[in-house]
Structure formats: structure tokens, C-alpha cells
A protein has these predicted regions:
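N-terminal regions that are enriched for targeting/export leaders
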Residues: 1-11, 24-27
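Domain-scale activation on soluble regions of proteins
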Residues: 35, 163, 472, 485, ...
Length: 500
């Protein structure tokens, strides 16, 4: 079945409170998707973020970002006043997220809401309610964040030895000492899940499904690595011997040093990949389809000695291969899992075979199609139908920004290949959209910025850089009636029209 969707991070939605949330604007965007003939909304990971603001470095694989809690709904519940929300300074740039102001302004409001919410409830009742509504791993995240705050937001490797190594007497003492702070984080997760479930339910009522995103690796500064050190390649002091990344290539002479702890795949095998089954249960409950980041890491992963300043001296190690996906099929009771494999970059024959064996759709990105001239596997005439095509992803420049960066030879090849000229001058983004929608790929997903024709300033992320990543926001006026009608018309022309 041919379908289409739009890619837009929740954080990039318009909002009067500085960052997108599960607010009226999210519901309006779902209405827009329906009007535009779309079937999917693809988002980025929803986990809580820290330094760097990357959704791919989260404090937990089983928790939600409190930035996305809708403050308006908390006012409707009597937990905040409108004046309290409007008095907070979240920044005044409708195009840019100021994460420092979000952090400084949002948590005091959430704490006020928590104080009112827990009024009349004993700490025991708060934790009992959390026990009914939240999973064990989510509650472990709440404990982790309470302890982390106790140690001035430091990562767990800098905590006192007893709690760092999770000695039973220390765990008991900190749970007792921080019971109210734990309750504060449990409150956040309860509200996050309530609001997300309501938004997802509304999306389904409108015929829109959600494509989520799951990073392959857990962050070092996370509840996952602290609470379950046996899952990772840690020594007797719970420190990594090697960390994750990518080797040097044409884009980076020293490679990419991500710094995430690597999995102890032998332990995962012995336990039937139980932690991964729990993780996928959480994701399948949250989303309708799940994009699995860095799929090739399940075949082979790049291990960089811990402490190295660059990724130059890593080595390739074998991953779990098809075994983990066979276990998922058995666990979830079906051959066809709702997974999209992020299979971008250099692919070895064994990675290609793994993708074929799983049957998962891979990804095709048009911005990569013209790097190797006529030999590129990303050119639409080389696709099979079992794939998802994008003009670009969150890691790419916008279509307009990308095209402007090409030399004249490559621009001419792009124009010649996609038949540029059907649309008015200066609308190369629409030509690329048409090429994606017209391909044989079962699903086409277009970043909102590429429907809007925005330049590099609307880019979401530039890998291996720090600074203004993850900050772009859409305005309320962007997806106007004319653009929505054009999206719907193209979806119809190419046989991808969603439910009316």
C-alpha cells in the first residue's frame, strides 16, 4: 500500500511556551496532516534530554521528556494558573528553542504543579499510584533523576561509591531520603504518558499513525547504564572498556566518537534479550512504527577504546545479528514487526543480508542519491518497494540548503534526473518532493521544512557539531491552506492519499 507522511519533531511544533509540546498545536498539526492527505507523522525520540539537547542521548530508554508536557492542560486541571505560565520566560523567538530558558522556566512550574497535585496524598499513595501507572524501568529513571539532582546533576560515575555501585544499604537510604523528589519525577512521567496517550488516540481517530525513533545505544549518563550495568561492557568498577562511534570516512577524518557504552551481547543472549524485549514493548506501546537507528550496529559495531579523544583507533566487533530479531518475532508473535531499519551509510554484504533476513524496510534518502552519479543506490529507479524514501532526515540539510551547497555539475545532474523545470524557478524542493512521492517506495516521508522550501537555517541537526542543533521551530503560519492543498494534490497524483 502506497502511503506518505511528514517528519517533524515534537519540539519543533509552535508553542507560546518556547518548545513544542502535546498541546493544542500538536492536535492542530494532526488535523493538518489529515487535510494534506497524509497517513503518518514521524517524530524523533521522546526521551528526556540533557547537555547538548540531543534526543539521541537520553537519561532513559523508558521515560518521556517533561518539556513536552502541555502546561495548558495542567492549568485546566487546576495545577497551574495561566498567569504563572505566562510570567515564565521561555524566550521570544518563535523559530528558535532556547533550552536554557526552557530548563530554567519549566521545572519550577512543574514543581508547583506537583505540590498541588500531591496535596492530600501521602508519599506512599503517590508511589502506589506511580506503581500502577508506570513501568519498573520508568520508575527506576525517576529514582535516578532524584539522586542525580542530589549530586548537582552529575552523572552517576561521580556519585558516592555506595550509591554509584548500588549497594543495598545505600539504595534503601537514598530512597528514604529522596522520597518526595522521586515523587516529583513520577508525577512528570504520569502526566507525560497521560497526555501522549491522549494525543496518539486522537491521531488514530484522524487516520494518522505515529512513527517513533529508537536510538540503538543507551547513554552513559542514564538510568539504564546505572541500574543495569550487567547489560554493558563494564569493568568491576562499572566503567566502560570501550565506547560506541563510527570510524573515519569521507565526512570525518577522525570518525565520530559518540561515547555511549557498548552492550554485553553475550549477557543479552543468555537472558533471551529480555531487556531488549522490554524496550521494544515500551516502544511498540508508544508508537505505531519504530525507526531503529544505526541498524548496522546489530551486525557489527565499532568499539573505540575508552578515553580515546577520537574514533581513529576503534575496531569492528560482531553484534547479535539475526538472533535478536528472531527473538523479537517469537516474543511478539509474528514475522512482520513494525520496524523501519535505518540502514544509511556504508553497508557491508552482511548488513545487507541481515536487512533481507529481517524483511524490514530500509531507508532511501534523495540527498544521498547524487553523490556517486549514476551508480548511487539511492536513485529512485534503483528502489524496491519495501523501503521508506525521504528527501532528507533530521541529520540532513534541508532540500533547498542542500541544493544550494552543490557545485554546478551536481546541480545539473539533479535537474536532469528529476526533470526540474516542471515547477516554477526556485522550487527545487517541490521537484525533490515529487521524485520521492513518485518513487515505488511503499512509504514516502518528507520533512516539513522541505514542503515549505526553507534553507539551511531550518536544519534540525548537523552531526558531529555542537551549537544550534535541535532548535528549529515551525511557526503557526507555515503550513498554510495553499501548501496543504498542494500536499494533498501530490499525494493523490502519486497514489498515496490517506483517509479523508
Amino acid at each position: 500500500m502506497r502511503e506518505c507522511g511528514m517528519l517533524l519533531p515534537v519540539a519543533s511544533l509552535p508553542s507560546r511556551y518556547g518548545i513544542g509540546a502535546f498541546s493544542k498545536e500538536a492536535y492542530d498539526f494532526i488535523d493538518t496532516l489529515k487535510a494534506a492527505g497524509q497517513s503518518f507523522w514521524q517524530i524523533l525520540p521522546l526521551g528526556p534530554t540533557g547537555f547538548g539537547d540531543s534526543p539521541y542521548q537520553s537519561f532513559s530508554a523508558f521515560a518521556g521528556n517533561p518539556y513536552f508536557i502541555d502546561l495548558e492542560k495542567l492549568t485546566e486541571e487546576g495545577l497551574l494558573t495561566r498567569e504563572e505560565c505566562l510570567d515564565a520566560d521561555f524566550g521570544n523567538d518563535e523559530r528558535d528553542i532556547d533550552y536554557k530558558k526552557i530548563y530554567d522556566g519549566r521545572f519550577p512550574l512543574l514543581r508547583k504543579a506537583y505540590e498541588r497535585w500531591k496535596a492530600g496524598r501521602s508519599p506512599e499513595l503517590v508511589h502506589e499510584l506511580a506503581g500502577r501507572k508506570l513501568g519498573d524501568e520508568t520508575r527506576e529513571y525517576c529514582f535516578y533523576m532524584a539522586v542525580k539532582n542530589h549530586f548537582d546533576s552529575c552523572s552517576w560515575n561521580l556519585w558516592d561509591e555506595g550509591i554509584r555501585l548500588r549497594k543495598p544499604e545505600a539504595l534503601e537510604a537514598y530512597r528514604a531520603m529522596l522520597t518526595d523528589e522521586i515523587g516529583f519525577y513520577e508525577f512528570q512521567q504520569i502526566k507525560f504518558e497521560e497526555q501522549w496517550d491522549a494525543l496518539k488516540r486522537y491521531a488514530h481517530e484522524q487516520g494518522i499513525r505515529i512513527i517513533g525513533d529508537i536510538p540503538i545505544y543507551a547513554a552513559f549518563d542514564s538510568a539504564d547504564s546505572w541500574s543495569r550495568p550487567e547489560l554493558f561492557q563494564f569493568d568491576e568498577n562499572n566503567m566502560p572498556g570501550a565506547v560506541a562511534g563510527c570510524p573515519p570516512d569521507g565526512f570525518s577524518a577522525t570518525g565520530q566518537l559518540w561515547g555511549n557504552p557498548l552492550y554485553n551481547w553475550e549477557y543479552h543472549r543468555k537472558t533471551g534479550f529480555a531487556w531488549w524485549m522490554r524496550r521494544m514493548e515500551y516502544c511498540f506501546r508508544m508508537y505505531d512504527l519504530v525507526r531503529v537507528d544505526h541498524f548496522r550496529g546489530f551486525d557489527e559495531y565499532y568499539a573505540i577504546p575508552y578515553g580515546d579523544a577520537t574514533a581513529e583507533y576503534g575496531r569492528w566487533e560482531k553484534g547479535p545479528g539475526i538472533e535478536i530479531f528472531r527473538q523479537m518475532q517469537e516474543h511478539f508473535g509474528g514475522d512482520k514487526l513494525p520496524i523501519i531499519a535505518e540502514d544509511l551509510g556504508f553497508l557491508t554484504p552482511t548488513v545487507r543480508q541481515l536487512l533481507k533476513d529481517t524483511g524490514f524496510p530500509g531507508m532511501k534518502v534523495l540527498e544521498f542519491a547524487f553523490d556517486a552519479g549514476e551508480n548511487s543506490d539511492y536513485l529512485p529507479h534503483k528502489y524496491g518497494s519495501n523501503c521508506v524514501v525521504y528527501t532528507g532526515t533530521h541529520d540532513n540539510d534541508t532540500a533547498e540548503g542542500w541544493f544550494a551547497s552543490l557545485d554546478e555539475h551536481d546541480r545539473n545532474f539533479v535537474r536532469e534526473y528529476i526533470g526540474a523545470g516542471y515547477t516554477p524557478e526556485g522550487e527545487i524542493h517541490w521537484d525533490l518532493v515529487r521524485a520521492a512521492l513518485g518513487s515505488v517506495a511503499d512509504l514516502a516521508v518528507i520533512p516539513v521544512q522541505d514542503y515549505l522550501g526553507y534553507d539551511t537555517s531550518a536544519r534540525i541537526n548537523e552531526p558531529s557539531t555542537l551549537g544550534k542543533n535541535w532548535r528549529w521551530r515551525m511557526s503557526r503560519e507555515d503550513l498554510n491552506e495553499d501548501t496543504v492543498k498542494r500536499c494533498r494534490r501530490l499525494a493523490g497524483i502519486y497514489g498515496r492519499l490517506g483517509e479523508a
